Every structure is written in C-alpha cells, then in structure tokens.
C-alpha cells in the first residue's frame, strides 16, 4: 500500500455535511485495509480564484495509506460528488502525521494576535515609569544646583 496526501475543497453551502462526507471517505479507505494517518479540517477559506462563481470553500486534508483500488474509488467519489469543487491527490514516500504548515501558521497567528495587546500594555506602563523617574531626576538636579 502507498501513502497519499489528499486535499478536498468542498462547496461552502455544504459545510454542515463535511463530517459525514469525511466519514464516508475514511470508511472507503479503511474498508480496503487502508489507514488514515492524519485528518485536518481547515474550515472555510477564501479561494485564490473563483470556481463556478464560488469564492470560498471548505478545506479538508487527509493523509491516507491505501491500495490503488481504494484510491480509485475515492477519486471517483470526488469526481461525481457535486459538493466537491476540487480535489488533489499527491503520492508521498512515507506517512505524514505531524501538523501541516497551514494549521501551524493559523495557531501562531492566533497567538500573535493575543500577545500584542499584552505587550502594548507593558510598553505603556514602562513609559509611565520612565517619565516618573525622569521627574525625580530633574528634582534632584534642581536641589543640587540650589534652584
């Protein structure tokens, strides 16, 4: 059996049915003795260009190990399902189980959005502390000069 990476773009109006569709595709793979190594639901994303006047799609990533017959059945299911806008199947040398770059970038983006608010608050308090210290230094200088 070979390893494959499968990306499926599903019509955004069918987003509620994505779990059932994924279950159907994974059962197709497992029925032939295959295995699903990784499943990622990337959610609804903007397309680079419109497909059939649709500007968004629901993205799903699967890394599977299956036979050629199971892969053929899977691609046939994609082809005849009207909800599937596009599908891409790439043959891999080994099973990939780690997080994809898109999921990692999405998590880092969420973390970055949370961090600046805290950092800005720290910068504001540091600026206030510095201005207080400068005022104290100015008073000390004036006292030394006898003003």
UniProtKB/Swiss-Prot annotation:
Biological process terms in GO annotation: translation
InterPro entries (UniProt xref): Ribosomal_bS6, Ribosomal_bS6_CS, Ribosomal_bS6_sf, Ribosomal_S6_plastid/chlpt, Transl_elong_EF1B/ribsomal_bS6
GO cellular component: cytosolic small ribosomal subunit
The keyword Thylakoid is assigned to this record: no
Domain of life: Bacteria
Keyword Magnesium: no
CDD domains found in the cross-reference section: bS6 (cd00473)
Stretches with biased composition (Acidic residues): 125-147
Alphabetical keyword list: Ribonucleoprotein, Ribosomal protein, RNA-binding, rRNA-binding
Pfam families, A to Z: Ribosomal_S6 (PF01250)
Positions of the UniProt region annotated as Disordered: 107-147
Molecular function, one GO term: small ribosomal subunit rRNA binding
Record field: transmembrane: none
Protein family per UniProt: Belongs to the bacterial ribosomal protein bS6 family.
Task of the protein: Binds together with bS18 to 16S ribosomal RNA.
Protein name according to UniProt: Small ribosomal subunit protein bS6
Organism of provenance: Cellvibrio japonicus (strain Ueda107)
Lineage of origin: Bacteria, Pseudomonadati, Pseudomonadota, Gammaproteobacteria, Cellvibrionales
């Amino acid at each position: 059996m070979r390893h494959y990476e499968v990306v499926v773009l599903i019509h955004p109006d069918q987003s509620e049915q994505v779990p059932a569709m994924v279950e159907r595709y994974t059962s197709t793979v497992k029925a032939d003795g295959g295995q699903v190594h990784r499943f990622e639901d990337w959610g609804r994303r903007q397309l680079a260009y419109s497909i059939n006047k649709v500007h968004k799609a629901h993205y799903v990533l699967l890394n599977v190990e299956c036979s050629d017959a199971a892969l053929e059945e899977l691609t046939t299911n994609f082809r005849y399902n009207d909800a599937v806008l596009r599908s891409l199947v790439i043959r891999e040398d080994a099973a990939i189980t780690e997080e994809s770059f898109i999921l990692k970038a999405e998590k880092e983006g969420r973390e970055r959005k949370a961090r600046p608010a805290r950092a800005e608050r720290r910068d504001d308090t540091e600026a206030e502390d510095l201005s207080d210290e400068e005022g104290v230094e100015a008073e000390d200088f004036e006292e030394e000069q006898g003003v």
